[in-house]
Each structure stands twice: as C-alpha cells, then as structure tokens.
C-alpha cells in the first residue's frame, strides 16, 4: 500500500517535460540588457524653437491667435453682437425688444388687406361665403334686393 503505484513514473516524466517547455518559452521572453548608450532626449520646446518654414513657435502662435480673433470680430460685427456697458443701455435694449414683440403680436391679429377693402375688378359673385363682407358690398346687396322687390310689385 505504501509502495509506488504502477504508471506514476510516466506522469512525473510528462509533468517534467511540460515544465521544461514552459520555462524555455519564458526564457526567450526575457529582455537582455543592452550595452548601447541610451537614446538622447529631444531638445526642450521653447519659444525660439523653429516649427516650420523658418518660423519660430511664438510667430506661429501669434499668427494663429490673430486669425482666430479676426474671425470672432467679423462674426460679432455681422450678427451685431455687442455687450451693453451701462444699465441705461441694458434697459433701452429690453424696452426695444419688448416693443418689437408687441408690434409683431398685434400685426398677426390684423386681417389681410383683401378682407378689409374691396379690390377693383373683382367678381363679386365669385366671392367666398366664409369671407367677411365689407360695408359697401352689403349696401349694394341691400339696394339690389329692394330693387327686385319693387320690380315684382
């Protein structure tokens, strides 16, 4: 019972072979230290560093910032973006916007011009039933109705 079991030697041999294969794979992955000198660091980036076209870094930054500033100023001029400076200007702008809103609201309630006045040359018989009659049309219709009644008598 306490002796060796049959076939356990092969198991040990197989385990040893597998362990050897793993160690061989790990050994190939180890990095060997290099004897070459370390790579030199790039020079530090300063404002006098030449970037491109023989222009220094501060030239490029200045030109780019002027370009962006000119675009912002142009857009503000086109869309009339102005920051008011005083309380009086702020209140005046508020009142102006309020008056403009009231004007547009009242303008929407006004009926179209063709409903308010008679258009010369318009055929009155083709008039829509839903449209609003003007005073002149009502008077003319009343006169025609009275004339027909007198003609029938």
UniProtKB/Swiss-Prot annotation:
Q: Does the keyword Transmembrane helix apply?
A: yes
Q: One GO term of the cellular component aspect?
A: plasma membrane
Alphabetical list of Pfam families matching this protein: TMIE
Extracellular face residues: 29-58
Q: Does the keyword Transport apply?
A: no
Task: State the superkingdom.
Answer: Eukaryota
Q: Which UniProt keywords apply?
A: Deafness, Membrane, Signal, Transmembrane, Transmembrane helix
One Gene Ontology term from the biological process aspect of the record: inner ear morphogenesis
Localization recorded for this chain is:
Membrane
TM segment ranges:
59-79
Tissue/organ expression: Expressed in brain, kidney, liver, lung and cochlea.
Matches recorded under InterPro entries: TMIE
Give the residue range of the signal peptide: 1-28
Q: How does it sit in the membrane?
A: Single-pass type I membrane protein
Which cysteine pairs make disulfide bonds? none
Q: Which residues lie on this side of the membrane: Cytoplasmic?
A: 80-153
The UniProt function text for this chain reads: Auxiliary subunit of the mechanotransducer (MET) non-specific cation channel complex located at the tips of stereocilia of cochlear hair cells and that mediates sensory transduction in the auditory system. The MET complex is composed of two dimeric pore-forming ion-conducting transmembrane TMC (TMC1 or TMC2) subunits, and aided by several auxiliary proteins including LHFPL5, TMIE, CIB2/3 and TOMT, and the tip-link PCDH15. May contribute to the formation of the pore.
Per the UniProt record, the associated disease is: Defects in Tmie are the cause of the spinner mutant strain phenotype (sr). This disorder results in hearing loss and vestibular dysfunction due to neuroepithelial defects in the inner ear. It is recognized by behavioral dysfunction, including bidirectional circling and head shaking. Auditory function in spinner mice is found to be reduced, based upon the lack of a startle reflex to sound at any age. Breeding experiments indicated that these defects are inherited in an autosomal recessive fashion.
- Its quaternary structure? Forms the MET channel composed of TMC (TMC1 or TMC2), TMIE, TOMT, CIB (CIB2 or CIB3), LHPL5 and PCDH15.
UniProt protein name: Transmembrane inner ear expressed protein
Originating organism: Mus musculus (Mouse)
Gene of this entry = Tmie
């Amino acid at each position: 019972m306490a002796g060796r079991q049959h076939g356990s030697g092969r198991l040990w041999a197989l385990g040893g072979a597998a362990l050897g294969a793993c160690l061989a794979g790990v050994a190939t992955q180890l990095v060997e230290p290099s004897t070459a000198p370390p790579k030199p660091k790039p020079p530090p980036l300063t404002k006098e560093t030449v970037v491109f076209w023989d222009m220094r870094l501060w030239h490029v930054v200045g030109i780019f910032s002027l370009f962006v500033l000119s675009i912002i100023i142009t857009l503000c001029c086109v869309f009339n973006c102005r920051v008011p400076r005083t309380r009086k200007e702020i209140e005046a702008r508020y009142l102006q916007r309020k008056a403009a809103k009231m004007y547009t609201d009242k303008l929407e309630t006004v009926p179209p011009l063709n409903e308010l006045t008679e258009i010369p040359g318009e055929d009155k018989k083709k008039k829509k039933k839903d449209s609003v009659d003007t005073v002149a049309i009502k008077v003319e219709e009343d006169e025609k109705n009275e004339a027909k009644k007198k003609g029938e008598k």
